């Protein structure tokens, strides 16, 4: 994904405000052993790019003064109530060094899963993204999660995911195999079943 940027030589609150008033957004590129570079981007193009999933999880080609640098979006600041991007951070990547990036999950075959189609269950997305470790060339835009065989009451875990070659999942918090999604019984049906069971328990013995 290509991003066109321009070098900027001034920084500070006043300079950033003037940039924003001119329809630009201040940004910085850092990392990969090179000096940080101050840049500016067209605000409207950036604002629309931030709405795209791939902008957050892909290697970006940032063109500055005719030179392209490969980088990841690492952070961005939004105005608390205006549709305004205040600042953006990009991190350079090296082709030979592994990166850690959060990648979105795309859930497939939810409607045809046995637990939904036959059991009338509800799909619960426990995770919507996962952190992966890989070389920049191996970074996937997303990871597919196939729910096509999931029965009611079953849970899909990280270990069940089919990962692209060269990609591993990074887990935190001590749980090495967290749940990704499950299919549960609708709350109304659970309540009805519980009430029916309680009613049967209240019947006098014959």
Curated annotation (Swiss-Prot):
Segments crossing the lipid bilayer: none
Cellular component per GO, a single term: cytosolic large ribosomal subunit
InterPro entries documented for this protein: Rbsml_bL25/Gln-tRNA_synth_N, Ribosomal_bL25/Gln-tRNA_synth, Ribosomal_bL25_b-dom, Ribosomal_bL25_C, Ribosomal_bL25_long, Ribosomal_bL25_short, Ribosomal_L25_dom, Ribosomal_uL5_bac-type
The entry's keywords: Ribonucleoprotein, Ribosomal protein, RNA-binding, rRNA-binding
Pfam families (UniProt xref): Ribosomal_L25p, Ribosomal_TL5_C
Molecular function GO terms recorded: 5S rRNA binding; structural constituent of ribosome
Record-linked NCBIfam families: bL25_bact_ctc, PRK05618.1-2, PRK05618.1-5, PRK05943.1
Subunit structure: Part of the 50S ribosomal subunit; part of the 5S rRNA/L5/L18/L25 subcomplex. Contacts the 5S rRNA. Binds to the 5S rRNA independently of L5 and L18.
Recorded family membership: Belongs to the bacterial ribosomal protein bL25 family. CTC subfamily.
Protein name: Large ribosomal subunit protein bL25
């Amino acid at each position: 994904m290509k991003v066109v940027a321009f070098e900027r030589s001034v920084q500070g609150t006043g300079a950033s405000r003037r940039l924003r008033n001119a329809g630009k957004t201040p940004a910085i590129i850092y990392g990969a052993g090179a000096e940080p570079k101050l840049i500016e981007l067209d605000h409207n193009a950036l604002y629309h790019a931030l709405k795209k999933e791939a902008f957050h999880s892909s290697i970006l080609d940032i063109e500055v003064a005719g030179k392209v640098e490969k980088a990841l979006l690492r952070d961005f600041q939004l105005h608390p109530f205006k549709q305004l991007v205040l600042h953006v951070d990009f991190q350079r990547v090296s082709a030979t060094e592994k990166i850690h990036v959060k990648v979105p999950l795309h859930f497939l075959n939810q409607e045809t899963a046995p637990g939904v189609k036959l059991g009338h269950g509800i799909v619960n997305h426990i995770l919507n993204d996962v952190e992966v470790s890989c070389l920049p060339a191996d970074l996937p835009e997303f990871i597919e999660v196939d729910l096509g065989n999931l029965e009611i009451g079953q849970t899909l875990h990280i270990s069940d995911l089919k990962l692209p070659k060269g990609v591993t999942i990074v887990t935190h918090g001590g749980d090495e195999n967290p749940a990704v999604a499950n299919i549960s019984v609708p709350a109304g049906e659970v309540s009805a079943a519980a009430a029916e069971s309680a009613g049967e328990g209240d019947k006098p013995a014959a």
